[in-house]
């Protein structure tokens, strides 16, 4: 379950940013989850709640934003949207693809008080 380590990293980063700026509470956190990130939002929410106990992030609302996977096709020189790993290019049917976005998890916003 890699979601626990991801949740802990997000908590640590949010807490660090809040305290560096003189805030003592993180009230909400927005995470962008790529469709190829292999991150389950329900699992990371569970891990987030458990790992946040006793930190300035405890009780913060967790919001998820979905990011579609996009790839560059070397065969047709187009950026295409993909729905699953291993999929052929929807434009030309080629398999020479490089994922350009949608394979990551990142914090997009932090709300503090």
UniProtKB/Swiss-Prot annotation:
Note one Pfam family from the annotation: HypA
Q: Which Gene3D superfamilies match?
A: 3.30.2320.80
Per UniProt, the keywords (alphabetical) are: Metal-binding, Nickel, Zinc
Q: What is this protein called?
A: Hydrogenase maturation factor HypA
Q: What's the family?
A: Belongs to the HypA/HybF family.
Could you name the domain of life of the organism this protein comes from? Answer: Bacteria
The opening ranks of the lineage are: Bacteria, Pseudomonadati, Pseudomonadota, Gammaproteobacteria, Aeromonadales
Gene Ontology BP terms: protein maturation; protein modification process
Positions of Ni(2+) binding = 2
**PANTHER family, alphabetically?**
HYDROGENASE MATURATION FACTOR HYPA (PTHR34535:SF3)
Q: Which GO terms describe its molecular function?
A: nickel cation binding; zinc ion binding
Which sequence ranges form a coiled-coil region, renumbered to this chain?
Answer: none
Q: Which InterPro entries match?
A: Hydgase_Ni_incorp_HypA/HybF_CS, HypA/HybF
Q: Which residues bind Zn(2+)?
A: 73, 76, 89, 92
Q: What gene does this protein come from? A: hypA
Please explain the role this protein plays, according to its UniProt record: Involved in the maturation of [NiFe] hydrogenases. Required for nickel insertion into the metal center of the hydrogenase.
């Amino acid at each position: 379950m890699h979601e626990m380590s991801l949740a802990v990293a997000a908590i640590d980063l949010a807490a660090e940013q809040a305290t560096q700026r003189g805030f003592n509470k993180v009230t909400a956190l927005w995470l962008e989850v790529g469709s190829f990130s292999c991150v389950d939002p329900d699992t990371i929410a569970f891990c987030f709640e458990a790992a946040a106990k006793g930190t300035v992030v405890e009780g913060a609302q967790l919001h998820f934003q979905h990011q579609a996977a996009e790839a560059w096709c070397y065969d047709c020189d187009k950026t295409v949207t993909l729905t699953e790993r291993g999929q052929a290019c929807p434009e030309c049917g080629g398999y020479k693809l490089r994922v350009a976005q949608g394979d990551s998890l990142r914090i997009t916003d932090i709300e503090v008080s």
